[in-house]
């Protein structure tokens, strides 16, 4: 699915530890809700800089969205880059009730 106007607000979590990444993700999604943004992008990377070459955030962030962050998110899906590698999520924040 393409975004109609091309620019999607993006949070880049590269270089952050788990606690800081989760905290930044929550802050970003609350701000997205407050601004009534239809969708946002969260980049966690592929893990090339992580020990073992497998990123921790690629597992932690989606799991957090499904559990503790579910009250902020209507849905999300992984978004591969041009090479087909998974390093980002497209997230649709829940709308705030009036």
Predicted regions and their residues:
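Long, charged, low-complexity intrinsically disordered regions
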Residues: 1-98
């Amino acid at each position: 699915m393409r975004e109609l106007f091309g620019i999607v607000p993006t949070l880049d979590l590269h270089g952050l530890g788990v606690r800081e990444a989760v905290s930044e993700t929550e802050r970003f999604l609350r701000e997205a809700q407050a601004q009534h943004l239809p969708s946002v992008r969260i980049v966690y990377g592929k893990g090339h800089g992580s020990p073992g070459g497998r990123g921790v955030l690629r597992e932690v962030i989606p799991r957090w969205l499904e559990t503790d962050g579910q009250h902020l998110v209507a849905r999300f899906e992984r978004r591969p880059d041009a090479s087909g590698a998974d390093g980002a999520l497209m997230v649709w924040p829940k709308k705030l009730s009036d």
